[in-house]
Amino acid sequence: MTQWIIWLAIETEAAKPEGGLFDFDATLPVMMVQLLVLMLILNAVFYKPLIKILDERKEYIQSNFNEAEKCLAQAAELTTQYETKITDARQNASKLTNTTRSEIQRFVSEKLEEAQKKADSELASATNKLELQKDEALKSLESEVQTLSTKILEKLLGIQIANT
């Protein structure tokens, strides 16, 4: 059977007239109709669904792109808000630090002043006590010096001196 198919193919090749791409005869309009029918079938079966899928994909990409732009704008806005809040927080922290520092300095200076006053008053009190003790010691020593000098004179002179 394969021999018959090969022989038939050879005979049809030999029966063809030699010429160009196709012959201008009654088969030309049939080929045009076949081409149009093929184009209509391909259009209905292949191209329209393909174009529909491509359009849907384009819309999907565009919607995702628009959503991404919205998210990007929202992220930029949130970043701006965040930076503003951070700046405000830093300023507030700086003010609080400065206020606290000045309060601590004031507190320390008050405590130092109180301690200085207390030390001065204790020093003055101690000085007064020492002065009083010195005066008392001098008075007691003065009377003792008087008594001792009288005794020394009595022993040296051998006379009794009356205490005045």
Curated annotation (Swiss-Prot):
The UniProt family comment states: Belongs to the ATPase B chain family.
Q: Which gene encodes it?
A: atpF2
- What is the name of this protein? ATP synthase B' chain, cyanelle
Principal subcellular localisation of the protein: plastid
What is the originating organism of this protein?
A: Cyanophora paradoxa
GO MF terms held by the record: proton-transporting ATP synthase activity, rotational mechanism; proton-transporting ATPase activity, rotational mechanism
Q: Where are the bilayer-spanning segments?
A: 26-46
How is the protein disposed in the membrane?
Answer: Single-pass membrane protein
Where does this protein reside within or beyond the cell?
Plastid, Cyanelle thylakoid membrane
